[in-house]
């Protein structure tokens, strides 16, 4: 099985396209080291039913009561022909394990659970994260980061430039789950997640 990878750089974020792949075969050597000699032929596989897309994994902030579980939205998105982001509803195969979710506990008492991926595999591009209730009078927040590197989910192609400073699209997404508030933090005047590009 052969694979090829498109390098992610400052020119990578483009609309969907049909790949044009030419395979140049110079010679063939089998497992017994027998070779055909020089062939010099080019094969062009039919890629008319393929569509290459630029994607990312988006995870959103959420808040609510410390007495109930929270479901943090997490979805696979693609950069479409309109140059906007949309949920990749055709994705029903992307897998992520619970252990691929790294979290930082900033609750007033230790969080006795772990974030869990809801859909395994993705359901129409949606994975979501379940966070169980921390319990009465336990407030604060948990930062959740899906680890997309090969030491985690091994989904490098779903990283993105979340900080607006990475031309290689090599950053994991992060979101905050805040427990113990119902309508937002009264101390904060306004909060918004920044989406670069």
Language model feature labels by segment:
Residues 1-197:
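Core sequence-specific DNA-binding domains of diverse transcription factors
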């Amino acid at each position: 099985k052969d694979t090829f990878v498109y390098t992610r750089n400052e020119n990578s974020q483009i609309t969907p396209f049909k790949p044009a792949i030419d395979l140049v075969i110079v010679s063939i050597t089998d497992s017994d080291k027998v070779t055909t000699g020089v062939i010099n032929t080019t094969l062009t596989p039919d890629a008319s039913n393929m569509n290459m897309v630029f994607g990312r994994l988006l995870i959103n902030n959420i808040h609510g009561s410390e007495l109930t579980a929270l479901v943090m939205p997490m979805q696979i998105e693609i950069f479409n022909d309109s140059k906007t982001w949309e949920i990749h509803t055709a994705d029903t195969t992307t897998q992520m394990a619970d252990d691929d979710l790294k979290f930082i506990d900033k609750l007033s008492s230790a969080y006795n659970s772990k974030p869990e991926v809801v859909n395994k595999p993705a359901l129409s591009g949606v994975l979501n994260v379940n966070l169980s209730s921390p319990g009465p009078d336990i407030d604060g927040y948990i930062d959740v980061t899906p680890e997309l590197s090969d030491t985690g989910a091994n989904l490098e192609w779903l990283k993105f430039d979340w900080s607006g400073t990475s031309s290689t699209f090599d950053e994991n997404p992060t979101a905050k789950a805040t427990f113990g508030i119902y309508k937002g933090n009264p101390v904060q005047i306004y909060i918004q997640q920044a989406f670069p590009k």
